[in-house]
Amino acid sequence: GFTWDVFNDKTLKVRGGSGFFTGRIPLVFFTNMPTNSGMIQNLVSITTRYKDGKVINRDPRLELLKGNMIIDVNQMISTLGLPTTITPEEGVLPSGIVGIDPDFKMPQVWKTSLALDYQIPASFPLTVTLEGMFSKDINAVRQFNYNIKSPEDTWQRFNGPDERYIYPENYLEHTNINSANVLTNTSKGWGWTGNITVFAEPAKNVNIMAAYTHTESKEISGMPGSDANSAWTNMPSINGPNNSGLMRSRYVTPNRVIASINWRVHVNKRSTSNFSLFYSGYSSGSYSFMYSNDMNGDGVTNDLIYIPKTKDEIKFTSAEDADAFWKFVNQDPYLKKHKGEYAEAYSASAPWIHRFDFRWSRDFFVKIGKTKNTLQLSLDILNIGNLLNSKWGVTKNMSG
């Protein structure tokens, strides 16, 4: 990174940096593999039962485990006399198999930022900051189901403007299991953030801050699940989760405005009070328009809709249904703007939420010996606007 004081007087600074950042994923996606590997698994419970402090039942196999802890799997199998083979009749085939790409890497992203701080000539301190950051996925994470056949040109498609593939009845590579999900990497994701922030002190002991941030982020998968299978089946798509392509990140907040004002009052030499009001405005979430059934026959019900462009592109059983549908489309900003297109995942935004928080604090200065100490008493009222109107500061999300 770097910081450049352009005029050597701190009125204009340019700063930036670039680097690679590595994180991790929830460990449940690693534990999915040994528990869903399709290999022989044997659960052994060896216990000793006590009653009134006396042993009433002791598993004789405990004697076999005396000494150093056994950490070799084969030695453990041999010591306990566990089976090393199993017949098809004795085994239970899992409905799905989970694996991890042997070349899998932890999530890694390349981030580059550039910012400008400018002190505007004014009768009071006034600073404007412009910031931009671009990120590129080096090793993003996704699930890929290798038991699903890839679409081919010989497959049938929908007739009309919606030309998505129709999966055949034999779309599974192996019919004796439903899925073979593999945790793997992709490098196709990217994102950028732009921010403008204004700091001002228009009067003594009065500080004002206001900022606006816009964010765009595209990804292959946000891993929307608690295990390998749900992280794959919950991905919105047109031609199946394996062929989802880049989509807007489900975790991004496209637009956000924040502001604060703080007034510091000197009560006396031993005490000051602070009054602060904080504002935050943003869309409370994003959602996708999807069919409620499995439109393309891939066994997943998260199919993104096609938004008809004209009335002749879609048929209804009654005129009332048609009127209700087009009334809904034309009142929704996203659907109205994207007629004739497939709906993009997580691109429709929930209503904005405007929230105010209030904070009052009182600082008491106490000198003990030669040391000056501060004792603070504070009161926080979160979402204070909701106390005035029950509809203010309320988050609205999709229920299904």
Locate the predicted segments by residue.
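Solvent-exposed loop/turn elements at secondary-structure boundaries
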Residues: 3-182, 351
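Extracytoplasmic loops and strand-loop junctions of Gram-negative outer membrane beta-barrel proteins
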Residues: 43, 94-100, 174-183, 238-245, ...
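Short loop/turn motifs that connect adjacent beta-strands in outer-membrane beta-barrel proteins
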Residues: 6-12, 121-125, 202-205, 266-275, ...
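C-terminal beta-signal and terminal closure region of outer-membrane beta-barrel proteins
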Residues: 348-349, 389-400
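Gram-negative outer-membrane beta-barrel transporters
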Residues: 129-270, 274-285
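Residues that define the transmembrane beta-barrel architecture of outer-membrane proteins
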Residues: 108-110, 190-192, 253-257, 352-356, ...
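Residues on the lipid-exposed face of transmembrane beta-strands in outer-membrane beta-barrel proteins
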Residues: 2-4, 114-118, 196-200, 210, ...
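Extracytoplasmic gating/loop element in the C-terminal half of outer-membrane beta-barrel translocons
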Residues: 82-86, 272-369, 376
